[in-house]
Amino acid sequence: MSNNLLKKKLRSALKLLSISVLLAVSAVNSSNSYAGTAIALGGGTLGYQVALSQSMSENLNLRITHNAASQSFDGETDGVDYDYDFEFSSTSLLIDWHVFGGGFRLTTGALINDNEIHAQSDINGLTLEVGDTVFTSAEVGRLEGDISFDSYAPYLGFGWGRAIADGFSVVFDLGVVFQGQPEVSLQTVGGTLSDNQLLLDEVEREEQELQEDADEFDLYPVVSLGLFYRF
């Protein structure tokens, strides 16, 4: 099964589960004093965020969020300069447990993780060292790569603030996404030696260097702030 097909199936399953849980929770909450729904706008290390929170009991809330953003920066790996483009896109289903009945809460859940990183070499000189061999920029063309992550990513964290409160409320989250070991692919594009086996071998060596740098993203820190409104 392809990665894109798996993501579509997981996303559909998450939507179906979310709708089912919300309907069930609404039925239960219709007879208690803790019924409530809140929507939010916010942002953090996963990007800009929209969220919907539904009370399940006095101290338990269901939260659905969608995060999206783009960010670019420059970096260097094994002597090669790269332009990196981060594409953030994720949808999460979370359970907030207000352990002591106040603002403090524990949060667990999972993300449908479409976060990706695109990389392209920034060749400023006449030569470029790929792996352990020096080539001319004309021979290499440019190096292009993609870094992808597990489609399903568990989340664990804690925070402060009650989404289901009177009127507006501010909530803070701090946690970790367990998105697994990244998968790196790298290729040479537009060079006179793009099909040369020596260059291809060195590109594979360069890919391994990128993989080592990307491995640190298996645990992704989450810090976010949101403004909720109960209606």
Features from the language model and the residues they span:
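Outer-membrane beta-barrel channels and translocator barrels
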Residues: 57-59, 100-102, 163-165
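Cleavable N-terminal export/targeting peptides
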Residues: 1-36, 214-216, 231
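Transmembrane beta-barrel domains of outer membrane proteins
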Residues: 42, 51-53, 96-98, 159-161, ...
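A membrane-pore/channel beta-structure motif
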Residues: 34-36, 55, 103, 107-115
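Transmembrane beta-strands of outer-membrane beta-barrel proteins
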Residues: 39-41, 50, 58, 62-64, ...
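Outer-membrane beta-barrel "beta-signal"
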Residues: 96, 100, 169, 217-231
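Transmembrane beta-strands of outer-membrane beta-barrel pores
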Residues: 45-47, 66-72, 99, 110-116, ...
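Extracellular/periplasm-exposed beta-strand and loop segments of Gram-negative cell-envelope proteins
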Residues: 66-93, 115-153, 180-218, 222
